[in-house]
Regions:
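Metal-associated gating/positioning segment near the N- to mid-region
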Residues: 46-111
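Hydrophobic faces of well-ordered beta-strands that scaffold small-molecule active sites
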Residues: 54-60, 87-89, 116-120, 142-144, ...
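Short, surface-exposed connector motifs at secondary-structure boundaries
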Residues: 83-88, 112-116, 239-247
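N-terminal metal-binding scaffold of metallo-dependent hydrolase/deaminase domains
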Residues: 1-39
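Active-site loop-to-helix "anion-binding N-cap" substructures in soluble metabolic enzymes
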Residues: 91-109, 113, 122-126, 144-154
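Histidine/acidic residue-rich metal-binding segments in metalloenzymes
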Residues: 126-144, 148-273
Length: 273
């Protein structure tokens, strides 16, 4: 049998240690680690080099400032250069998934240099009702932006394929939406990714900073207190326990938040971070 590619001579890092083997690749996958040198179309001499597993980046935003057919090429190319072999996109749609998901999937499939997956962001009750549709079309994780609502509800959605127009929306990810997303995700056996900030606290903090004419990173940080983060973590963790849902807290930004996560784990919440 002739394989696509054979990489010879490298030190291969595995979960159990470093081994010296040849690596056989076929149809884009590693199919065997061996001492043999089978027939191949391409042979790469990696003598003295180290082969490490590709990095999985589970949290990437692209398709917002350029349409996905352009963004996927540029961002996945950069990912590949940096050793990221799987990237997971936070898809944000301002309209129906039943209406727009198919085009996003089609244009994505023709544009990536590396493996990829998609998290579906849920902003409305109508989109909650489309979570089953997302799963049926291969999207099996969901994102909640607890930071978006009220005076801080503005967000840029992903562009439509073939268009190059920014799509600004105003959303309100309220307690009803959060509860229904967690409940539905649990019933589907899907995890929920969480941006954990309380938008009411953040909105109040930003308003106070503006009233005092404060600006810069320090003002930004003070307007989004760690208590906002820990409060959101506590709120959604209780829901996750009630419905037996798995949570993944993205980009935790404070010691207070991490302490709250540890406390929620002790309470039985299934959490990744």
């Amino acid at each position: 049998m002739t394989y696509d590619t054979l990489i010879v001579g490298s030190h291969i890092i595995t979960p159990t240690g470093i081994i010296d083997k040849n690596m056989i690749l076929d149809e884009g996958k590693i199919v065997k680690l061996t001492n043999e040198t089978p027939s191949c179309d391409h042979r790469i001499n990696a003598e003295g080099l180290v082969s490490i597993p590709g990095v999985i980046d589970p949290h990437v935003h692209y398709g917002v400032y350029s349409p996905i057919e352009q963004a996927a090429q540029s961002e996945s190319h950069a990912a590949a250069i940096g050793g990221v072999t799987t990237m997971m996109r936070m898809l944000r749609l301002g309209d129906s998934y039943e209406k727009s998901l198919s085009d996003q999937l089609t244009y994505s499939s023709n544009s990536h240099y590396v493996d990829y997956a998609i998290h579906a962001s849920i902003f409305t009750l109508d989109q909650v009702n489309e979570m089953q549709f997302c799963v049926e079309n291969g999207v099996t994780s969901f994102k909640l932006y607890m930071n978006l609502g009220g005076e801080v509800g503005h967000v840029y959605m992903d562009m439509k394929p073939g268009e190059n127009v920014l799509r600004e929306e105003c959303v309100e990810v309220n307690s009803e939406i959060i509860t229904k997303v967690v409940q539905k995700a649990a019933s589907l056996g899907c995890p929920v990714l969480v941006h954990a900030e309380d938008y009411e606290q953040c909105g109040c903090g930003i308003k106070k900073s503006k009233e005092k004419n404060l600006d810069g990173l320090s003002a930004w940080s003070k307007s989004r207190p760690s208590e906002s983060e820990s409060h959101s973590i506590k709120t959604i963790s209780k829901l996750a326990r009630d419905f037996n849902c798995v949570l993944y807290f993205a980009h935790i930004g404070s010691r207070t938040a991490l302490q709250q996560i540890n406390e929620e784990r002790k309470n039985g919440t299934k959490i990744f971070t």
